[in-house]
Amino acid sequence: RGLGDVYKRQGLYDSRMGYSPFQRGAPPERETQMEETILTAQNLKFRYDSDQPVYALDGVSTEVKRGEFVAVLGANGCGKSTLAKHFNAILLPESGKVYVEGMDTADDDKIYDIRQTVGMVFQNPDNQIVATVVEEDVAFALENLGVPPEEMRRRVDDSMKMAGIYEYRERAPHNLSGGQKQRVAIAGVVAMRPDCLILDEATAMLDPRGREQVMQTIHYLNRNMGITVVSITHYMEEAAQADRVLVMSKGHVVMEGTPKEVFSQTEKVRSLHLDVPQAAELRDELVKAGIPMPEGIIDTGECAQALYELLQ
């Protein structure tokens, strides 16, 4: 069946949605937008097994501003994915609080609104794709919500264009590359018009080209659409492009700051069993070799510029 058949089905608009979908307009200036907090964790504690003494999250307190791009780093088992799942109430705190736009995730009456506000994209796109045609998959959740057919058509088309998959709209997802599939999953979430997008290792299974395509899409959504992004990742080059970086270890946030503030502490980052961006590593090696290099280099452009100036 085609998407046209989906749109012809009668659906009732769910008045609880309480928004006019896709009428977002131009995003506010980032400085103004990022004054407002959208996600808050207060002394958050969580265990997967209440009979065990080890906490996956042990007193985590942090917040994310509206419009911000936050990267969360940490070794395997540090709690970063567990934290992500608390931000849209997939998991609930054992103690402490998590708020999404002021809504308590422990409030059953707010779960619907919280999951409208915060969308998630997971590591394996095949686990989120449910339809046999790309545009049908992007429309799937909207159909379930009873979004009017004309609005559904507009939102599906706009989301596919933003994710760079409009040309694949009539293709079968299983014939797409990993990066293209992940962008289908992103389009499906974006069509719901979330204010915040959580990426849980969303590029981990992709090749370098696929990672680049997905991250270009994510940065477009953040910069041009004003969507808040929290990216759980182990790719340092991705984290270096964020507004802010959180580093977790054993259920705690142990480092926090801008990418320059965090990655300039190369020895501390390595002590947490993490890599640093290649440019930062090269800068350290050049300094060890007696070549003066400025502090805070975290990308190849900065490194190349510093070397160019030294050679003048």
Whereabouts are the PLM-identified features?
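Short, small-residue-biased leader/transition segments that mark boundaries at the very start
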Residues: 1-7
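Conserved ABC ATPase "signature" region
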Residues: 150-168
